[in-house]
């Protein structure tokens, strides 16, 4: 059946998932031909592309918040979504209604010349929606790698690299040097590049030099430091002192501030401070607040006052696990209880690398099953954990909420329950608390 602009979004998404013979098929030829035909390669007067292993989402969010507070019209394309596809395209900090997406999908479908992957289709649709909205700035979050990612059909004015670590090795290579080369594919000749990774592989620096990019590197051109009450950011011209703590990692906030220095907009220090206080993104070391704690208590049939501290995080690789370990270690100084993990991970992720950072701080593990062709069972994950770290206490459950229920039953008020390991893990939990 031919889908129409008025067909339900769920039907369109099902169609997108099946529209190409491979779910991931890196390359720019298919998508670029459609984008050129529809004149989608220039979605706004200024475009920022953000790549990196971790930290892309929070860096994009702070850049978006700053630019909106400066009074600009801003669009953001990000992935993956947590609960609803609509989260992937934001215009003026608003998700678009289903009808906007289905109309855009129909337009792309009518004009495509060959089959497209889900991500290629959604990228073209986002660019079409941005162009219709007449924006000042578009922020594109890279989906996978950079050089061959669908977002790379657009020549951005500023490239941002948040971090570099080993992930997606089937597509990007199994060394930091190979991965850095792929991520450097978003660089453009004579355009500025901001790098938030402190240990930059030479392959990335070589690519920047080859293209005559103006590079702004962490700990070389700019730096940040934090203390118990606030933090500071500085480069060779600007020093921002007594900055407010924010709800995203300092390294990502600092990278966004470095990117702001490269923009052609005169953004005030007041706007930066206001934005740091406002910025937040679901699933990034996020403590569950009172209203959602009540929903969890109702769901489990327990008094809300008996619930422990509950934190969710989408971290799913060793680099993210290291950050989690640091945050949990700091938290442990202020509580008296145990650290309990509810962990669900996709089978193509480096689970042992994640466990290595977290087993010293986690007192008990509940490994849970994730569905889908990339999912793995809680039993498989628990076996991996116990085979490499035989001293740990680990059980398995058939779903995220089964694991959460088991963990919360064993926890007391001063404990911490961490739900993490994948966007899918957090999404399954979040669907209940929302």
Please place each PLM-identified region on the residue numbering.
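C-terminal helical cap/extension that packs against the catalytic core
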Residues: 194, 198-203, 210-212, 225-228, ...
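Hydrophobic positions on the alpha1 helix immediately C-terminal to the Walker A/P-loop
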Residues: 58-62
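Nucleotide phosphate-binding/pyrophosphate-handling subdomain across enzymes
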Residues: 132, 137-140, 150-160, 164-168, ...
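Extended acidic/charged loop-beta regions that coordinate divalent cations
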Residues: 125-171, 205-239
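Charged, amphipathic alpha-helical linker segments immediately N-terminal to NTP-binding catalytic cores
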Residues: 1-22
């Amino acid at each position: 059946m031919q889908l129409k602009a008025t067909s339900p979004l769920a039907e369109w998404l099902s169609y997108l998932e099946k529209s190409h013979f491979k779910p991931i098929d890196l390359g720019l030829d298919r998508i670029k031909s459609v984008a050129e035909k529809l004149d989608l390669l220039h979605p706004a007067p200024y475009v920022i592309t953000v790549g990196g292993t971790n930290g892309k989402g929070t860096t994009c969010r702070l850049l978006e918040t700053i630019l909106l507070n400066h009074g600009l019209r801003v669009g953001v394309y990000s992935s993956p979504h947590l609960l609803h596809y609509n989260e992937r395209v934001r215009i003026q900090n608003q998700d678009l209604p289903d009808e906007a997406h289905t109309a855009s999908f129909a337009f792309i479908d009518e004009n495509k010349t060959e089959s497209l992957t889900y991500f290629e289709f959604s990228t073209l649709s986002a660019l079409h929606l941005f162009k219709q909205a007449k924006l000042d700035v578009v922020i594109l979050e890279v989906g996978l790698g950079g050089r061959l990612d669908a977002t790379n059909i657009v020549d951005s004015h500023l490239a941002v690299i948040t971090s570099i670590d080993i992930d997606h090795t089937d597509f990007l290579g199994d060394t930091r040097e190979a991965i850095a080369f792929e991520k450097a594919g978003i660089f453009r000749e004579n355009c500025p590049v901001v790098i938030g990774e402190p240990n930059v592989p030479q392959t990335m620096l070589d690519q920047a030099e080859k293209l005559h990019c103006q590079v702004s590197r962490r700990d070389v051109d700019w730096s940040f430091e934090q203390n118990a009450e606030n933090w500071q950011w500085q480069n060779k011209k600007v020093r921002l002192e007594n900055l407010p703590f924010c709800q995203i990692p300092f390294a990502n906030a600092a990278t966004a501030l470095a990117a702001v220095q490269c923009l052609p907009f005169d953004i005030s220090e007041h706007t930066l401070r206001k934005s740091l206080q406002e910025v937040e993104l679901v699933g990034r070391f996020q403590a569950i607040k009172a209203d959602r704690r009540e929903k969890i208590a109702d769901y489990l049939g327990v008094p809300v006052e008996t619930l422990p501290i509950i934190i969710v995080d989408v971290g799913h690789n060793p680099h993210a696990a290291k950050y989690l370990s640091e945050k949990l270690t700091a938290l442990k100084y202020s509580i008296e209880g145990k650290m309990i993990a509810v962990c669900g991970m996709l089978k193509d992720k480096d689970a042992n690398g994640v466990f290595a950072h977290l087993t010293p701080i986690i007192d008990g593990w509940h490994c849970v099953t994730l569905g889908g062709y990339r999912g793995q069972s809680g039993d498989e994950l628990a076996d991996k954990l116990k085979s490499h770290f035989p001293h740990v206490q680990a059980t398995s459950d058939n779903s995220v909420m089964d694991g959460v229920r088991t963990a919360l039953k064993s926890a007391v008020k001063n404990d911490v329950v961490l739900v993490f390991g994948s966007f899918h893990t957090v999404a399954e939990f979040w669907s209940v608390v929302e």
